[in-house]
Amino acid sequence: AVLGLEVARRADAALAAFAATRKPGDVLDAGLWRASRHPNHLGEQLFWVGFAGLALAHRGAWDPCCLGFLLNHVPDTLATLPLIDARMASDTKRVRNFLKYEAAVPLIYPTPASIARAFRGAKAD
């Protein structure tokens, strides 16, 4: 659960710093954002999985706290994140950069390839 909070905190801090200095056409493609298109949402998912794991370890059975993951994950994956991506792709100044980014980086859950990409850094692209 703590790991999830830290991932979300770092992703949100990077997003705030990017938003303060971005130019038209820019896409955030640094740090955690090189491994996941929505690492702040990944952090929330990790928080709920960790919370469910704590409940399992403490009580030996899944209980209603596990619903947090489902109630967060399902709307995120089916509605919120696709809408955010559609808005990004509809911005004429950044559509080319975003489509390239979208092709290279998974929606939420990092893959081995996206993790390797994150460690290589932007200069390797």
Report residues per predicted region:
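Hydrophobic transmembrane alpha-helices
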Residues: 1-14, 19-125
